[in-house]
Amino acid sequence: MADKTLNQIRTTFLDYFEKNDHKIVESSNLVPNNDPTLMFANSGMVQFKNIFTGLEKRDYVRATTSQKCVRAGGKHNDLENVGYTPRHHTFFEMLGNFSFGDYFKEEAISYAWNLITKEFGIDKNRLYVTVYHNDEEAFNFWKKIAGFSDDRIIKIATSDNFWSMGDTGPCGPCSEIFYDHGDHLEGGLPGTKNEDGNRFIEIWNLVFMQYEQISKDKRINLPKPSVDTGMGLERIAALLQGTHDNYETDHFKKLILSASDTLNVKVTDDNQSSFRVIADHLRASSFLLAEGVLPSNEGRGYVLRRIMRRGMRHSHLLGSKKPVFYNIFKTLLEEMSNNYPELERAQSLIKETLKTEEEKFLVLLDRGIKILNEELEKVEKILPGEVAFKLYDTFGFPLDLTEDILKNKSMTVDGEKFDLLMKESKKLAKKNWKGSGDSSVDQIWFDIKDRLGATDFLGYSTDKAEGVVTLILKNNKEVQDLQENDEGIIITNQTPFYGESGGQVADTGIISKEAFEFEVSDVQKKLGDLFVHYGKVKRGSVKLKDNVELKIDTQRRNNIRAYHSATHLLHEALRRVLGEHVTQKGSLVQSDRLRFDFSHMKPISDEEIRKIEHYVNSIIEKKSEVKTRIMTPKEAVENGALALFGEKYGDEVRVLSMGDEEGKFFSTELCGGTHVVNTADIGKFKIISQSSIAAGVRRVEALRDAQLIDFLKEKENQSNLSDQKNEAVIKELETKIIKLGGKPNLQNKDQVTLIKDLNRQFDQLSVISILKDKDKNKINDQTINGFKVRFQNIIDLPFKDLRKLIDEGKKEIGEGLVVIYAINDNKVGLAVGVTKTLEKKFDAVKIVRAGSEVIGGKGGGGRADFAQAGGTLPDKIEESFENIKKLIN
């Protein structure tokens, strides 16, 4: 196998188990869809968790996978070791085979032994295994199958050889297979003091789930024991290619060579750690971006940003002064897109995000390192936590990046002080990612679902139906009935009410019978298909097993379904106009509007908006029939259906297609929502606003038909007052232009003065027009430390007009401060104004400098009452304003 590539080794593993009646199951998403408490998939068993716990069943009992995994952040965090050891990665692939109540220890050991010694051809004399100290079954099976003597089967009594899902749930002993890389490397056998060396390396872990942990002191046998195994692809590839170092495999060599060529720097012993960091972090960053995770300051996005910035800092160490990551991506695409086509589908988004993020970070990096070096001259061994926090808070240096810089200087950081400052900071609200586990409330729904089964949803074909009350809840407790004015929950055996999901809001309506009426205010789908009606009894009473009529608000439903269909058309139009990198990041489909969030790095131009609207309206005007088909997920994707990352699909999916375009559908998506029968039912469509909600994420809002007419009338009424005020000015300008009588005489002082006056007045009208546009002009008046502060964020405003708006703002607030940010052409202008009465207390120059350093600016200038600066980081506006607020306080 020494001549096999990493890709070929992956194929050999999967093919071997497929020949042995295992179903090859595609890797699940890195962002788990069955465990919201887990940050990233970190092992092969994550996607099978609910099968092992009995909450889910599939049509196979044997499976094999190559699972994408990320270990960075949370409980499993390998980030700080990457680049400095032969085996640590942030992104890796976990090969595995699984038995769900089918075969057990003997077969699992036999499959493993045959694969590694026969298919892979590994010398059995270099192999050792461990078993849990009291697992005599596994001990004896290894002797029988492998012919091992007792000294090659090592009994381990620690938790390293006993696996559990949590404090309760499935658990069992492990058996690990180790390979001896030779006595030229340091390290001892597992269980010895020097077991952590590079000589004896674990290559495969076999987990035998045979118990269920009921409580701390109680454990019972599972009726159907299962098997979960994990083998790191990069680790086995290193072994089979004759090295103990994962970074010396064919795959990493290509990535490192690509980085070397791009940077025009040769790999040496002194700089190889940096090249390894770049190769590893490019993989993790690209796969996370492909799934729609974008760099941000919280949650998964923050972990991605940490990975990206650590890698980019190492390219900077190698002499790079411009973005390089996006250029190296092409090699990763060549290497992995055949097995992971999502890389190709998202390549535009990946490259653009890598480039933009590196451009931003390089600006911050130079300034941050300068400050860090100045502070390092003042200390000997430990960097104060306050400095590390400033680097994090102002320059976007994650703590582990600062630690990585200090590592080469044999220094550390005061982590305790840093953590304390993080807790005190109100800016970044980090989510507390705990271990796996379900809340007690969730457990209620599991129990109810077990008793009642799924609810039959009839809402695709009808807006009313009869049903039987199967369960009533009041204050989260089961009761026999509900009386007048009681608030509670009703579950029926079937329902036409749509439960909130997929961005579509729930139906509302009435559940009734003679002398009883329950007003439904919300409907939620629990565990996928248990429909739960929330509401209040308006009259009468209801009890278990009553026959009732369920009727939705039809007019509201019709509006919702029209907006949902419009959302599908909008999604496809965005992809066609802006590019296939556009992926849905969120949506809200209501009865009076739609909101759609998607990945895109810059504002949409007016021309692009016109094209998008034209696409949508042209399909609506064609009066195309909307077609619904039921398929397997694989068939749906083969038919061009657009599936959404993070969505969980069953064995059959609902495929919605609409819009006839030269014999093909304009839009095809997997969707469980309600939709129009014909696109004509949508009515006229228009985008009314766009905004940025996060770095790389845009939001558009749109209206249709009656709501659009109402909106336009309201906007017209709002503008009439301003138009009346401006009308006199416009007429005066027209009169003055006529007086010029054609081409002006620039030698005539009166005409030159008139031209300047015209320009001034036109500029004034331009400013007034922007102020009227609520979509471009966001104003937030606050009181800080007893003073009025106006925070204003404006899109498309020429920076030269900032002074005018500051003056207008100061007039409006009377006494206080005005802080205005203007975004134009992906750059940001900042202006600060201080009213006359406060000039002795506040200095506009100091305030503008506090804000400009965060948005990538270089100081700023002006006077005590007005100062202005520019920057290159518009996504940092909120943080910049927070910095200003601190100074004011």
Curated annotation (Swiss-Prot):
CDD domains to which the protein is assigned, alphabetical: AlaRS_core
On cofactor binding, the record's note says: Binds 1 zinc ion per subunit.
SMART domains, A to Z: tRNA_SAD
Molecular function (Gene Ontology), one example: tRNA binding
Q: PROSITE patterns given for it?
A: AA_TRNA_LIGASE_II_ALA
Q: Name one GO biological process term.
A: alanyl-tRNA aminoacylation
Q: Where is it located?
A: Cytoplasm
Annotated residues for binding of Zn(2+):
564, 568, 671, 675
Q: Which domain of life is it from?
A: Bacteria
Matches recorded under Pfam families: DHHA1, tRNA-synt_2c, tRNA_SAD
Please provide one cellular component term from the Gene Ontology annotations of this protein.
cytosol
Q: Which reaction does it catalyse?
A: tRNA(Ala) + L-alanine + ATP = L-alanyl-tRNA(Ala) + AMP + diphosphate
Q: Which family does it belong to?
A: Belongs to the class-II aminoacyl-tRNA synthetase family.
* Domain characteristics, as noted in the entry: Consists of three domains; the N-terminal catalytic domain, the editing domain and the C-terminal C-Ala domain. The editing domain removes incorrectly charged amino acids, while the C-Ala domain, along with tRNA(Ala), serves as a bridge to cooperatively bring together the editing and aminoacylation centers thus stimulating deacylation of misacylated tRNAs.
Alphabetical list of NCBIfam families matching this protein = alaS (TIGR00344)
The protein's name is Alanine--tRNA ligase
Q: Which organism is it from?
A: Pelagibacter ubique (strain HTCC1062)
